[in-house]
């Protein structure tokens, strides 16, 4: 099972139990966070697609750690003027572990639902 969800302007592809880094969230370590802007959920039988979001779709995750990302170096340089300016930036990140992806079929209200077994059968048999 996997899902695609959105935080701000970024989209993340996650599976249950996966650990990912997202932009800093102002919650304490050990708390749970719930993401409601779910774009797509795929379970064993169906794919649910939102327009743009799935109504009752949610992803629950544990906050593991707050840290800084990799350093990005910025250089400003003017030729023949002996001018150089160096700057660095480290983005604040939050490490989360996906605990649960809501796949309760009766609760999900989505734009489109595709039955995977039927779709694959149609492609194989040429219907």
Swiss-Prot record:
Keywords assigned: Ribonucleoprotein, Ribosomal protein, RNA-binding, rRNA-binding
InterPro entries: bL21-like, bL21-like_sf, Ribosomal_bL21, Ribosomal_bL21_CS
Transmembrane segments: none
Gene Ontology CC annotations of this record: cytoplasm; ribonucleoprotein complex; ribosome
GO MF annotations, alphabetized: rRNA binding; structural constituent of ribosome
Domain of life the protein comes from: Bacteria
Entry keyword Coiled coil: no
Pfam families assigned to the protein according to its UniProt record, in alphabetical order: Ribosomal_L21p
Annotated family: Belongs to the bacterial ribosomal protein bL21 family.
Function: This protein binds to 23S rRNA in the presence of protein L20.
Assembly and oligomerization: Part of the 50S ribosomal subunit. Contacts protein L20.
Protein name: Large ribosomal subunit protein bL21
Species whose genome carries this gene: Blochmanniella floridana
């Amino acid at each position: 099972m996997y899902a695609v969800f959105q935080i701000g302007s970024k989209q993340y592809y996650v599976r249950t139990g996966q650990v990912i880094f997202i932009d800093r969230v102002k919650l304490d370590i050990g708390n749970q966070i719930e993401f409601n802007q779910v774009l797509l959920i795929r379970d064993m039988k169906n794919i649910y697609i939102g327009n743009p979001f799935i109504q009752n779709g949610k992803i629950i995750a544990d906050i593991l750690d707050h840290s800084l990302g990799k350093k990005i170096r910025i250089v400003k340089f003017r030729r023949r003027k002996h001018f150089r300016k160096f700057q660095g930036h480290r983005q604040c990140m939050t490490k989360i572990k996906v605990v649960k992806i809501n796949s309760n079929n009766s609760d999900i209200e989505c734009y489109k639902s595709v039955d995977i077994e039927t779709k694959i059968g149609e492609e194989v048999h040429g219907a």
